[in-house]
A protein has these predicted regions:
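Active-site-proximal alpha-helix that buttresses catalytic centers in soluble enzyme cores
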Residues: 1-76, 80-84, 92, 104, ...
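A short, acidic, amphipathic alpha-helical segment used as a generic capping/interface helix at domain edges
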Residues: 91-100
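Generic beta-sheet signal
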Residues: 105-111
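Short, glycine/charge-rich flexible loops or terminal/linker lids adjacent to PRPP-binding catalytic cores
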Residues: 88
């Protein structure tokens, strides 16, 4: 899932990972969008999930506002938008991570457009969920996308 609405593009020059005041954050509309997505997921039976997030504040805030359970930070979900040299390594790391997980319950990864596009080929809008299925060959198959 791509984080919900956060006005702007990229991150400011003074970006610091552990300081939300230096980041592009969710707007009020983005917070409401995440809450609506959480309610919609609950209405179709996903009342709890394993939720993993990039360490970026806009992703953590999206994950928290879904209201589906505790959030675990997963650094391979961090954006590589400003460091494209990390694209291949990070994408392989997250693909291997997905393939090693027990996915008996719904699993939601909240991340960034560049990460999702590198992994799936899909260019998601803010708040869009890209559903993938693991294949026997340790790959991922696109099932579809969901955008409220």
């Amino acid at each position: 899932m791509r984080h919900t609405l956060a006005p702007g593009f990229g991150d400011p020059d003074n970006f610091e990972l552990h300081n939300c005041d230096t980041q592009r954050n969710l707007s009020t509309e983005g917070i409401i969008q995440a809450q609506k997505i959480g309610k919609l997921l609950k209405s179709i039976g996903i009342v709890t999930a394993s939720v993993y997030s990039s360490q970026w504040c806009r992703c953590v805030d999206t994950a928290n506002n879904l209201g589906l359970g505790p959030i675990l930070l997963l650094p391979p979900l961090n954006s590589f938008f400003q460091t494209l040299s990390k694209k291949e390594r990070q994408t392989n790391t997250i693909r291997n991570w997905i393939n090693s997980q027990n996915l008996d319950k719904p699993t939601i990864l909240v991340t960034h457009q560049v990460n999702i596009t590198a992994l799936t080929g899909v260019y998601p809008t803010s708040g869009e969920i890209v559903v993938v299925k693991r294949t026997r060959a340790s790959g991922l198959k696109l099932v579809g996308t969901f955008n409220q």
